[in-house]
């Protein structure tokens, strides 16, 4: 049986304003396992993106507990959540969030450098990620020159380069035509055989042939949680190593910082104090 990697227990989330309090999530109880491709659906304002942002560590939850590989996260401080986002979650955004004046290859190298890898010795690895999404011929093109579908493929390749067990995708096909969108969903399905992929979508008809599970939210509550397409294959155990992505030693952090400085200096980008590469 596939390993449970995430468990949400009675998770609630509130949004506060000067005059009101809105409960965005209401006592959510869910478990997610490796090898799943989960579609989160529901009407606008139902809590889909809030749930995804809580899962990915982008938003704190207010009540309940979220367990990552059996360990509670309620006591995480800012540094713990930063490490979680950086080393545990691969992000695929609707707006791509690429560095537009970088080439496709350099966008992937940036993700590898943030992990402390040397850019020169990582080019072969970066090309391998581009190959997985069918972008080897576009490696030397700037991100700004790519089509919308190619940009989303590049966004997926960048998420792959983080080598995380979890990929979250927020409306990854929202800016794409139906044919290109289906290609993106197909790529995510292929990746989900060795990872957990969680996707928010308004177009469930497009996703239905590919996902293994559908969760539907209404007014912040789970109203549907059903399996869709069963899989019999075993998940690759290489992707179930609890120690992967642990916080590096001080010497490793120094090496990582040096690679970051060198890489971004070459690209004529001034690193802002405190830059951590969240989203990369």
Descriptions of predicted regions:
Residues 56:
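Helix-to-loop junction immediately C-terminal to a conserved catalytic motif
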Residues 187-199:
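Conserved catalytic loops of ABC-family nucleotide-binding domains
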Residues 102-110:
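Short coil-to-helix segment of the ABC ATPase nucleotide-binding domain corresponding to the Q-loop/switch region
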Residues 86, 141-144, 162, 193:
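Conserved signature/switch motifs of ABC ATPase nucleotide-binding domains
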Residues 64-72:
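Conserved ABC transporter NBD signature motif
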